Amino acid sequence: MRIVEVVDARGHENVQSTHRATFEVTRETRLTRRGDCVVAVGAMKGAADLNLRFKEAARKDNARITITIEADEVKEVVRAKGNSRLSFTHPMDLVVRRSGYVCGRTVAVGADKAASHFSRKLVEKMRDPCQKIKITLTVES
């Protein structure tokens, strides 16, 4: 089964994209320079808003999750895994982790990239507050 979820967001001048273990997309519109894992703000969805079918499929331990982050023609593809402990309860944030840590904000674990691994060309685009960013989450289980 393959389920696709699309989240629209935008850039912010304070995007750092330097965190080595996670990356985050948030519904918040403000961002301080301390938020080094945040790659997009003003998202249309948080973890709690994702489609029920997506959540159910992602809760399978053998689920493969692909996250594509696009800003115009520049994109980054991240491969991660699902986990039976994913709760998808956070109303504001979507967090992808390289580790196996799970909380209400976590939407995928075991990722092959974190914020610091994103191309600097993409990061430059993500620093533009007018830049539209499209996040596509695809789960296959």
Language-model-detected regions and their locations in the chain:
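N-terminal intrinsically disordered, low-complexity segments enriched in P/E/S/T
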Residues: 2-6, 12-14, 22, 128-134, ...
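A low-complexity, Ser/Thr/Gly/Pro-enriched, surface-exposed linker/loop concept
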Residues: 11-32, 66, 70-97
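Solvent-exposed alpha-helices and their adjacent loops that cap or buttress functional pockets
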Residues: 29-33, 58-59, 99-101, 127
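Short, recurring structural edge motifs at helix starts
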Residues: 34-41, 54, 103-109, 123
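A generic structural signal for short beta-strands and their flanking turns/coil linkers
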Residues: 35-37, 61-67, 90-92, 105, ...
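Short, well-structured hydrophobic secondary-structure segments
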Residues: 38-79
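Short, structured patches in soluble enzyme cores that scaffold and shape functional sites
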Residues: 43, 71, 98, 111, ...
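Short, solvent-exposed interaction modules
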Residues: 49, 74-123
